[in-house]
């Protein structure tokens, strides 16, 4: 004899346990993702604070960026992108960029007539809002050449017209 009542009750208990397990797993996964995001956000925030207070040479900026990418496995790459002519009065573009490629640290300068970084959302929106911003995922053709999301933090330097 088969007791349908018991099998229904067992099925109900099993479904309940599955729901609880799925809920716990989703909360655990969400906590891990949030932890990684918070760690990633701290990296450019700290860089922006140091850039606000200091006047780095080109060599010092390159070393700072390289060490940042080397020492932070959770990020793909990093740039410090200046307003046109702000870092060097003779150069429209100044955006050194270090990134990981096949477990190596690679370097390039981004910014050219074909890649005007100051027109991209990752640069433009934080500047306009004067606050840190996560970009929507995008294919970064010309710099990373991969799908990425960018966390951008504006920074300022004292210029001839005040804070720029």
Name each model-derived stretch:
Residues 1-63, 148:
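Juxtamembrane extracytoplasmic/periplasmic/luminal helical "stalk" adjacent to the first N-terminal
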């Amino acid at each position: 004899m088969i007791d349908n009542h018991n099998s229904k009750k067992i099925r109900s208990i099993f479904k309940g346990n599955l729901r609880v397990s799925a809920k716990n797993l989703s909360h655990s996964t969400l906590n891990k993702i949030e932890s990684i995001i918070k760690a990633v956000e701290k990296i450019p925030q700290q860089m922006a604070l140091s850039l606000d207070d200091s006047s780095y040479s080109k060599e010092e900026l390159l070393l700072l960026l390289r060490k940042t990418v080397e020492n932070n496995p959770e990020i793909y790459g990093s740039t410090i992108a200046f307003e046109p002519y702000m870092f060097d009065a003779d150069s429209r573009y100044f955006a050194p960029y270090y990134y990981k490629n096949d477990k190596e640290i690679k370097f390039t300068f981004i910014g050219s007539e074909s890649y005007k970084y100051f027109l991209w959302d990752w640069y433009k929106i934080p500047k306009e809002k004067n606050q840190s911003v996560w970009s929507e995922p995008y294919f970064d053709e010309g710099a990373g050449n991969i799908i990425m999301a960018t966390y951008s933090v504006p920074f300022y330097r004292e210029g001839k017209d005040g804070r720029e």
